Amino acid sequence: MNKFCLLPFHGKRIGVANIPFTILFKKGPCFLHSHITAVYYSTKGKNDSHEQSRVSKKSTFTPLETPWYLRIVDNEKELMEGKKNNHHTMNKELEIPKTSPNSLRKIADLLTGKLGLDDFLVFDLRKKSPNSVSAVNKLGDFMVICTARSTKHCHKSFLELNKFLKHEFCSSAYVEGNFNERQESRRKRRLARKSNLSKLLGRSSECSAKDLNSEAWYMIDCRVDGIFVNILTQRRRNELNLEELYAPENEKSKFQNIDSGNVPTISGVNEISSNNNILLGLRRLAQQRRRYSTINPNGLSNLRYFLQKEDFKGANKIIQSSSGTETHNIRTLEHVKNTLKDLVGQERKVDVVQWKSLFDEHSTFLTINQSAAYWPLRLEYAILLNKADPQFYSDRVFLKDYLLLKKSLGQELIREDLIALLEMVLKTQHSSHSYFNLVKQNRVIIRALNLFKGLQTEDDGSVVYDEEVISLLLNSMVADERVKLRSLYETIDHIFQTFGDKLTSGMIVSILQNLAKIKDWNKLLQVWEAITPTEGEGQDKRPWNEFINVINQSGDSHVISKIVNNGHLLWIRRLNVNVTPELCNSIKALLKTAGMENSTLEEFLVRGTNNQ
């Protein structure tokens, strides 16, 4: 052990005690030991005696095992080792569907290994039930969700994933949520403009631009085996909670956002900062909608008075002055609808444009309960507008104003919506029954049918295969004897292949009527014979009464004589058809037209059946 001492020094008029300082050097860390002597000095004359009072106090410092600056490297090593261990355990616990393709495993290894994305989840969308089909099931088979550390990490991960897909699978990914420099500059200008407007309105928007730029969501279509990859920042993932959307029905409860209130969203930050502004709170209190009604008892009668006169300015004033609860708003719209119904029933000419704008202006979409009461009301109102002026509120307007609007707002279309459109198509009158006008109508129907794909009726059948829907569809394909769509025969064949022996009487009658309308008697008889039962007697449930009426109403003597002379009516006795009074009258009328009234055939078909 080496010892180094500092010698004491003397000063004038100061009594100093020897203060030895000793520094000990060892092989380990160095420590400082000191023996401190307290000194009192005087400013009196030279002759004054020096009064010295020595109070010695020893203080020792407890040595640390390892200084902080020597622990930095060790802590970093432990942190790196912990990350490696977590990464290995995460790879071991990585769950991928068993029947998934090898490409999904390669993409998962890239995301969790090289790119360092966390919280990796894979949802298999192939096993979804038909009742819970969404747009995602139509697009892909596997949905991947993972978390990035920042927006730059999201962008870098997308670039690396795109390079990997090009190299491994010769596929270029499609991404949503990636902003280029021009879009980012445009976004910043909008945020700056929004912040300026917020300052004028007394709102605080200090953190809005910063918060929006610090969160990201990249949705990537790999275009490989139906794989979609979602890369999100942690806060954005907590806000969106995509896991609950993609999870199966029996596992959605596992991903419900229970602690979502603790996540500080962007809107929440702005709301907290704005609530601290007292003036803003007073302004919001003054501008908020009242949740009580101030309408007088005669309000509805006054509204009806203005609507009957078509004074829409006065009607608007009454509705705005009485705006209250959601139930009251629905009741007001019902009153408007009933007034229009009375005017249309009286065949009065109404201003359809003003009536439509009045209903749209006071329509709201606030809650699920209100939407459930609103859409049937809007459907009835649209039918009344079409009845009042089919040229203005045509089938094309109904498609955009009702069907597309309802679908875009997340509401489910129902059977009555499609029937209403088909009835409007049939009511639309053109100046001439040309083939091109019929094609235009058919295009509207095709666009509407695309909206109803995958929708089921109460009987677990497709809405498109409903009996009334099929009847209206067939009627829309025929204008007259000369004008018909070329797809009519293909549609009839498709109906026979789809239903087979389960064809209903309504479908058969609709097919017969449309074939009789175009006077294709050979196809009509071919269809009628194709549905003849073969299992034995007593099984013939074909609509004989409607079949005979269609033949008789044609007035074609050649067709009628062919039906009678070729023995088609004899199948009534052979298959023991239940001859009702209506069928008896139809047989008599047909034989009378054929000139065989009171004949042996009539007695055999009608009277012989009555004797049984």
Curated annotation (Swiss-Prot):
InterPro entries with a match to the protein in the record: Atp25, ATP25_mRNA_stabil_dom, NT_sf
Top-level taxon in the UniProt lineage: Eukaryota
UniProt entry tagged with the keyword Transit peptide: yes
Transit peptide: 1-14
Membrane-related topology note: Peripheral membrane protein
Family: Belongs to the ATP25 family.
UniProt GO cellular component terms: mitochondrial inner membrane
One of the GO BP terms on file: mRNA stabilization
Species of the source: Saccharomyces cerevisiae (strain RM11-1a) (Baker's yeast)
PANTHER family: ATPASE SYNTHESIS PROTEIN 25, MITOCHONDRIAL (PTHR28087:SF1)
Name of the protein in question: ATPase synthesis protein 25, mitochondrial
The keyword Transit peptide is annotated on this UniProt entry: yes
Function noted in UniProt: mRNA stabilization factor specific for the 0.95 kb OLI1 mRNA. Also involved in OLI1 ring formation.
Compartments where found: Mitochondrion inner membrane
